[in-house]
A protein has these predicted regions:
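N-terminal beta-propeller domains
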Residues: 1-93, 129, 133-174, 219, ...
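Residue-level signal for tight coil/turn positions that link beta-strands
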Residues: 82, 115, 172, 197, ...
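A generic structural motif
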Residues: 173-179, 207-218
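Surface-exposed loop/edge segments in extracytoplasmic proteins
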Residues: 91-97, 200
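Generic recognition of flexible, low-complexity loop/linker segments
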Residues: 107, 190, 200, 238-241
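Elongated alpha-helical scaffolds
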Residues: 80, 99-128, 250
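Ser/Thr/Gly-rich low-complexity blocks that favor extended beta-strand/coil architectures
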Residues: 126-135, 182-211
Length: 277
């Protein structure tokens, strides 16, 4: 008895389930295969063998790979390891940078990309952005929030159910501030306090109720007030856990001390978290 064979040229249905074997009445059966291994299916229906692998370099310890797609023709691979990042294009390493993330922190990183900027967040590390300019120069830098009239429009938050009163020794320059409750930790150094319409950067924590700081935006008064708030993100309070883009806004999802909170930037102004009046 002669064996009959047929020519099959269309595999757009991919690898079909064993439950469909023998179902010649279905279009998916006609355009599928029982097994497709190490091949690439083309939109026109044909298949070709996948490309082979090529040794480029040795990965160092724990490594995480992230895509960086500027457009369909400019695609990069970011190789993150212990406090280091290598950038690959095609078959070579084109840049190597130092990073703030240890090998143990790599798999807690969350990221999102817009055009030539990749945003990365980790709950224990200040958020960073990876940028690539037209000359393929790569940089890692801190987020820069929108600033107007000396006010930095980052997210602020009241961490207390009953907010302590806060007062200041002056309205400009180097000042001291105090509260009527235990508030401050040594990790607050470098973070910001929004005091009424003014802004202060903490330079020294002298105790749980006393700090020294530099006025960034002039204070309107110095008396006791409950109208103040901390920067939502700091070494004392933790940093963003996740980040994405939605309807042309940057969305920050949770932080170490505020795991269930969302912050959305102004539309078309990704680093502006001004709440308005």
């Amino acid at each position: 008895m002669n064996n009959l064979g047929s020519v099959k040229t269309n595999f757009t249905a991919g690898q079909v389930s064993p439950n469909l074997l023998g179902r010649g009445d279905l279009k998916i059966y006609e355009n599928g295969a029982r097994r497709l291994e190490n091949v690439i299916i083309h939109p026109t229906g044909g298949v070709s063998r996948r490309r082979g692998l090529k040794y480029i370099c040795r990965a160092e310890q724990a490594t995480r790979l992230l895509p960086f797609e500027f457009n369909t023709e400019q695609i990069y691979l970011l190789c993150l390891s212990d406090y280091k990042m290598k950038v690959f294009k095609d078959d070579r390493c084109i840049a190597e940078l130092e990073t703030p993330w240890s090998g143990n922190q790599l798999f807690q990183l969350n990221y999102t990309q817009s055009a030539d900027t990749l945003l990365l967040v980790h709950p224990d590390v200040p958020p960073k952005q990876v940028t690539r300019n037209n000359n393929e120069v790569w940089l890692i830098s801190d987020w820069e929030y929108y600033t107007k009239d000396d006010m930095i429009y980052m997210p602020y938050y009241n961490f207390y159910q009953k907010k302590p009163q806060l007062w200041a020794s002056g309205t400009s320059g180097e000042i001291t501030m105090a509260t009527d409750a235990d508030v401050f930790l040594s990790a607050h150094v470098g973070s910001y306090l929004k005091y009424q319409s003014g802004l202060v950067k903490i330079t020294e924590v002298r105790g749980p109720r006393d700090i020294a700081g530099t006025v960034i935006k002039k204070l309107s008064a110095t008396g006791k007030t409950n109208d103040w708030a901390e920067a939502a993100f700091s070494d004392a309070r933790g940093w963003p856990v996740s980040v994405t883009f939605h309807q042309n806004r940057m969305v920050i999802g949770g932080s170490r001390d505020l795991p269930n909170r969302l912050w959305l930037s102004k539309s078309s102004d990704l680093f502006n978290f001004d709440l308005g009046k």
